[in-house]
């Protein structure tokens, strides 16, 4: 413990900088997008909340198989007033992509537009299929 205290006191600025960077990263990640949901929570949302499920992958990937009830839409169409995007600001929305990265960015964009109940399938469709859950060909 004595060595640890000595290290902290000798490297105080480095420690403060490191803690600041970690805090900024945590805040950034929390603001970045919607709530990340696992496959079990996603299944619960589909069965209980009747969400708008949007698959953000390409049309070819979507046609090969997606979550039942999902609509294929490009991230650029996730804006109020777009004919393909039917959700209102308080509706439950679930975004799906291949790995969860595109969905997280798009969820952040929706939050900036005032949408409050945005969810992202953690790990995307890859996680869904690895969990043994079914896909529907469109």
Specify the residue positions occupied by each region the protein language model found.
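Active-site flanking residues adjacent to catalytic metal/cofactor-binding acidic residues
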Residues: 54
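Rhodanese-like catalytic fold shared by cysteine-dependent sulfurtransferases
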Residues: 1-40, 45-51, 59-92, 98-138
């Amino acid at each position: 413990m004595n060595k640890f205290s000595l290290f902290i006191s000798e490297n105080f600025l480095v420690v403060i900088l490191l803690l600041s960077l970690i805090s900024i990263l945590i805040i950034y990640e929390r603001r970045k997008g919607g709530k990340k949901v696992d496959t079990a929570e996603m299944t619960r949302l589909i069965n209980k909340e009747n969400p708008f499920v949007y698959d953000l992958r390409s049309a070819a990937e979507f046609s090969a198989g997606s979550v039942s009830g999902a609509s294929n839409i490009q991230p650029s169409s996730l804006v109020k007033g777009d004919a393909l995007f039917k959700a209102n600001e308080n509706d439950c929305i679930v975004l799906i992509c291949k790995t969860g990265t595109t969905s997280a960015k798009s969820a952040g964009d929706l939050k900036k537009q005032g949408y409050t109940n945005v969810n992202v399938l953690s790990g995307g469709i890859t996680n869904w299929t690895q969990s043994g859950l079914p896909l529907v060909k469109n």
